[in-house]
Amino acid sequence: ALHFVGHHVDHELVENIEADCGDRLERMREGEPRRFLLTMGGAGAQRELFKAVVDHMVPMVRSGEATLFVNLGDHRENWEWLEAELGSIRSEVHLHTTWDETRELADELRTSSTSGIHVFVYDNTFHAVYATNYLMRVIDVMITKPSELAFYPVPKILNERVGGHEAWGAIRSAEVGDGTVETRTIPETLHAIDLLTREEDLLTMYADGIVKNKAIGIYDGAYKSVALATGTVW
C-alpha cells in the first residue's frame, strides 16, 4: 500500500513550531539582525554561489542588518577553501568546531541577540548533520539547495538545484508557503536575501504558513510512518 504521510521532520522541530515562529516574528518587530543559516553539502557544490552569498552579506552583517551562520558540515576542505577566499574578512569570523560549543551558542540564542559571522565545521558526521537541525530553531531564514531540507518547517530561500529531482523540493515548499521558489541564478538568490532582510511581509507569510501547516498535519510524516509501522493510530 502507498500512504501519503507528510514531511519527515525531527520531533523537536515540529513540537516547537509555534514558539520558534513566534520568536522569529518578535525578533523582526524588535529590529534585531535577521539571522540566516547557509548550508553547504559535503560535495562542496555551488562554491561560486556560496562565496557570492557570503560576500553579499558581509556589509549587511557589519551594518547590523543580518547575522550569518554557515554550516560546512564535516568536510574541512570546505573550510580551507572558504578561509582562503575570505582574505581580510577572516578576522571577523567566529569558528565553531565542537558540538558542545554549538549547542551552548544555540541555547543562548533562544533568549539573547547575536551578531557577526559564525562558521561551523566538525570532525564528526553526526554533529555536522545535527548542527543544522539544532541551529534551525534559532535562526530566521535558511539558505539551502532544495534537497531534503526543503521539507523542514523553517522559512527558506531555496537556491539553484544540484540534482534535477531537487526541483520538486522547491515546488513543494512554495506550494505549502514555507519557502521561496527556486532562485535559479546568483542575482535571484541575493535579491531574496535582501527582501527577507529589509521587508517584513515574506518572513511573516512563511512563519504564519508554517504554523498553519503544522495544524493540518503537513509536518507529521515521521509520526505517521511510525504509527503505520507499529499498527498504532496517529
Task: Name these PLM-found stretches.
Residues E92-A150:
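Donor nucleotide-activated moiety binding/catalytic core segment of transferases
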Residues L109, L195-W234:
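C-terminal amphipathic helix plus adjacent low-complexity
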Residues A1-D55, N71-R76:
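A nucleotide-sugar donor-handling region in carbohydrate enzymes
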Residues T67-E80, T97-D100:
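Glycosyltransferase donor-sugar binding loop
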Residues A1, E80-S91:
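Short, aromatic/basic amphipathic alpha-helical patches
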Residues M142-E200:
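Catalytic binding pocket for nucleotide-activated donors in carbohydrate/polymer assembly enzymes
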Residues R35-L37, T67, P155:
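Residues that mark the start of a beta-strand
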Residues H11-E26, R35, F126-L135, D140-V141, ...:
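Active-site/ligand-binding-proximal alpha/beta "capping" segment
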